[in-house]
Amino acid sequence: MFMINVLTLIIPILLAVAFLTLVERKVLGYMQFRKGPNVVGPYGLLQPIADAIKLFIKEPLRPATSSISMFILAPILALTLALTMWIPLPMPYPLINMNLGVLFMLAMSSLAVYSILWSGWASNSKYALIGALRAVAQTISYEVTLAIILLSVLLMNGSFTLSTLIITQEQVWLIFPAWPLAMMWFISTLAETNRAPFDLTEGESELVSGFNVEYAAGPFALFFMAEYANIIMMNIFTTTLFLGAFHNPYMPELYTINFTIKSLLLSITFLWIRASYPRFRYDQLMHLLWKNFLPLTLALCMWHVSLPILLSSIPPQT
């Protein structure tokens, strides 16, 4: 029975990932005054399926000097961790209702660094290794601010359980009292998922393609799917934290529709940013975090700690 539950979570995620690639190409196309994919199927709707078939029937090449076990294990680990992070997300009911759901998600996103590092190292290519080291430095750095922002939100929430956020936001979305946190959170999620304008790991002009430069066919597709699954997951997480949808237990589908629309709009914002902004320089990327975001988030965290004490009130209890 549990396997059926897992499959009912994984299959829609994989479908969402497939169609997000199509949405991305369409949105970028229209933003650049062109059509995007429109040949395979009506309005190009079958394009992701054609892409998947093409990628998975190609021969998976690997460099002769690569470390085989790690080279194959890295993309599998990347996708597994990307799918595992969906377990505690309330939509409106999570697969497993964890007491420390937020902590679980932080731990899983930290583990995802290993797949990037292994892929870069096992490829035995200078470009891949430099791309991997950049990605690891970027991911680890931005996780610091993500953790502090999460702590501030959880102080308002009063619980580490993600489902409690639905109750906390019945009266007002947390984006209103905590808009500076929400802005920094959104920018940090862009950096965490290695998206433009923070896609330094894929600097085509200098690194060819980044840590996945030696990958082809199936393993490359797994990395690609992991990246897009993480993008959707981060947007869903943002919706849960700052744009909580109203949940009526008698009509849970209303929550799901509300929640899906918000997540889709956030995903399109990701694509809009990609179409609009040029890439950061690497030192600017690190400067933004360590010199700007970190002091601000620490100050706001202290503010959120002191406010309930100042007003001698307590956060909502569960």
Curated annotation (Swiss-Prot):
GO terms for cellular component: mitochondrial inner membrane; respiratory chain complex I. GO terms for biological process: mitochondrial electron transport, NADH to ubiquinone; mitochondrial respiratory chain complex I assembly. GO terms for molecular function: NADH dehydrogenase (ubiquinone) activity. It is a multi-pass membrane protein. The keyword NAD applies. Signal peptide: none annotated. Pfam families: NADHdh. InterPro entries: NADH_UbQ_OxRdtase_su1/FPO, NADH_UbQ_OxRdtase_su1_CS. The chain crosses the membrane at residues 2-22, 68-88, 100-120, 147-167, 172-192, 217-237, 253-273, 294-314. Its EC number is 7.1.1.2. It is found in: Mitochondrion inner membrane. It catalyses: a ubiquinone + NADH + 5 H(+)(in) = a ubiquinol + NAD(+) + 4 H(+)(out). The keyword Ribosomal protein does not apply. Its main location: mitochondrion. Keywords: Electron transport, Membrane, Mitochondrion, Mitochondrion inner membrane, NAD, Respiratory chain, Translocase, Transmembrane, Transmembrane helix, Transport, Ubiquinone. PANTHER family: NADH DEHYDROGENASE SUBUNIT 1, NADH-UBIQUINONE OXIDOREDUCTASE CHAIN 1. Belongs to the complex I subunit 1 family. Core subunit of the mitochondrial membrane respiratory chain NADH dehydrogenase (Complex I) that is believed to belong to the minimal assembly required for catalysis. Complex I functions in the transfer of electrons from NADH to the respiratory chain. The immediate electron acceptor for the enzyme is believed to be ubiquinone. This is NADH-ubiquinone oxidoreductase chain 1. It comes from Ovis aries (Sheep). The gene is MT-ND1.
